[in-house]
């Protein structure tokens, strides 16, 4: 390799980064590069970091690499990139020049004080790496903000149209009641029945608006913000009956059968009643929506452990494809079966946040053509909530 390097040059290692992919050829190239460097490493300090491009995409972008394998000489001196399948041949030809450049770089300099910070992998963390990490963090923050903004825009666009439907129906029902009430002084039984039906329709539609607004408010909260709950002792059976009454018109209009299986000795829950009602309404609303006319919906509660109660809602609908079970609780997820149904794909995400805020768990079991069962757990009253 010619004359030995000066002490100044020896004080600063040659910093190299080798970018490879997962192809079998990559391991062969890594070994050949190491062999070439080993020939001079006894007299010249060399730091080689092998990087999988899939693990460090920010560095690939930072160095503007377009081909793998690629070897980046970070320093001393100016940066240089070798790439392609003949990389090892390029390195064998280029390495002597790098060593000469290293000697020239330090020829008129004082020996530097070596104080190189190291990464978790034990490799030098150079200013270039620090800049790349900072750049990557900014990219991540920008991507998160962009995704958040896009999500909010999608929600607003969806809500702008869909909120008008139940609101228009409710207002029409109320206006009709007002007009009819002026046309007779003594209402007959039939007329009163009609008025009651209109009132029920208005109430149902207004509650639907209330539910959608609640979902939107929860879904638009920052994902990292913990959900606030006000837990207290809750008797499950009366709360369930209130929810069933609220959705009565929905399942009765489809002639569906609702079966409840709640043990009389079920312990009281330690939960926020409004949040628990929100979960039940969402899950039952979905069950009613996807169960065909004449189908069956079952609500069951089981005291599984001394600290948890499991609540399950089953339907006889079309079921959920297995490959979509893992994403069903994410924001704005709309399955292929949902194309003809109302909704934004945020209800189940809200349910998950509520259940997790109670230190519970929610999951689904489903087979295509055999319906779905959503399970979630809630703490019993004597359970002490963590601070």
From Swiss-Prot:
Residues 1-97 are annotated as: Interacts with KaiC. GO terms for biological process: circadian regulation of translation; circadian rhythm. Transmembrane segments: none annotated. Residues 158-382 form the Histidine kinase domain. Autophosphorylates in vitro. Signal peptide: none annotated. Gene3D superfamilies: 1.10.287.130, Glutaredoxin, Histidine kinase-like ATPase, C-terminal domain. PROSITE patterns: HIS_KIN (PS50109). Homooligomerizes. Part of the circadian clock (KaiA, KaiB, KaiC, CikA, RpaA, SasA), the composition of which varies during the circadian cycle. Binds to the CI domain of KaiC; KaiB(fs) and SasA compete for the binding site. Binds preferentially to doubly phosphorylated KaiC. Interacts with LdpA. It comes from Synechococcus elongatus (strain ATCC 33912 / PCC 7942 / FACHB-805) (Anacystis nidulans R2). The modification Phosphohistidine is found at residue 161. It is an enzyme of class 2 (transferase). Changing residue 94 to A: Decreases KaiB-KaiC complex cooperativity. More severe decrease. This is Adaptive-response sensory kinase SasA. Pfam families: HATPase_c, HisKA, KaiB.
């Amino acid at each position: 390799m010619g004359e030995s390097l000066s002490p100044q040059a020896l004080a600063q290692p040659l910093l190299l980064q080798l970018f490879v992919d997962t192809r079998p050829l990559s391991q062969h190239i890594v070994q050949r590069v190491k062999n070439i460097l080993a020939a001079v490493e006894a007299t010249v300090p060399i730091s080689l970091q092998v990087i999988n491009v899939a693990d460090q995409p920010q560095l690939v972008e930072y160095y503007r690499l377009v081909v793998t394998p690629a070897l980046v000489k970070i320093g001393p001196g100016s940066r240089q990139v070798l790439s392609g399948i003949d990389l090892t041949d390029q390195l064998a030809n280029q390495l002597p020049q790098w060593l000469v450049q290293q000697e020239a770089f330090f020829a008129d300099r004082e020996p530097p004080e070596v104080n190189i910070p190291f990464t978790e992998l034990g490799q030098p963390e150079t200013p270039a790496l620090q800049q790349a990490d900072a750049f990557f963090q900014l990219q991540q923050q920008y991507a998160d903000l962009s995704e958040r903004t896009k999500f909010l825009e999608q929600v607003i666009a969806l809500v702008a149209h869909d909120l008008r439907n139940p609101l228009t129906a409710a207002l029409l029902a109320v206006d009709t009641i007002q007009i009819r009430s002026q046309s007779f002084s003594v209402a007959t039984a039939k007329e009163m029945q009609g008025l009651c039906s209109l009132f029920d329709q208005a109430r149902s539609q207004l509650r639907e608006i209330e539910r959608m607004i609640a979902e939107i408010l929860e879904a638009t909260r920052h994902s990292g913000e913990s959900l606030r709950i006000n837990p207290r002792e809750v008797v499950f059976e009366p709360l369930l009956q209130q929810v069933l009454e609220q959705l009565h018109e929905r399942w009765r209009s489809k002639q569906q059968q609702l079966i409840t299986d709640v043990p009389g000795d079920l312990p009281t829950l330690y939960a926020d009643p409004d949040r628990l009602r929100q979960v039940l309404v969402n899950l039952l609303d979905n069950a009613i929506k996807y169960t065909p006319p004449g189908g069956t919906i079952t609500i069951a509660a089981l005291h599984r452990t001394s600290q948890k109660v499991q609540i399950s809602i089953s339907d006889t609908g079309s079921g959920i494809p297995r490959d979509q079970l893992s994403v069903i609780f994410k924001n704005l997820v709309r399955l292929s079966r949902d194309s003809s149904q109302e909704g934004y794909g945020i209800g189940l995400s809200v349910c998950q946040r509520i259940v997790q805020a109670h230190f519970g768990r929610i999951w689904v079991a489903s087979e295509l053509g055999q319906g779905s069962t959503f399970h979630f757990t809630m703490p019993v009253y004597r359970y002490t909530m963590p601070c």
